[in-house]
Amino acid sequence: MLSFGVTVLPDPPWTRWLELIQLAESHGFEYAWTYDSHVLWQESIPTLAVAARETSKIHLGHFVTNPATRDPTVLASSYATLNDLSDGRMAMGVGRGDSAVRYIGRQPMKVADFESALTMIKEFMNGREVHWNDKDLQLKWVR
């Protein structure tokens, strides 16, 4: 069966953003996405946390986030926390950081760096240990 989702722009006020996500859920949409360009729109991690608690069925996530503006360890921890808050309803759309990074005067990640960051994020999200910056790291609380 085909899945349907909606992208809701994270413009103020966040209460209207939440209303639109709740409306999508009430109409049977399976996914609600939001953007992650931290200078262009409101910060989306806290609003996704609110949506996780104020909805019960719809899957939530970024369309897209990136490991160029969000450190991969922070991104993995944030999504693991959001996934816990939402009872497993988080979905991560992830890219190299084109618009978010260009807007602040930087270049998107190189493909090899993106692949490395994505591998690390996936390992963290699955509770596995990651060797990074000469350290063995793990999100030990991830279920």
Predicted regions: what is each one?
Residues 61-78:
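Structural motif corresponding to the early beta-alpha repeats
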Residues 39, 66-67, 97-98:
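Positions that flank functional sites
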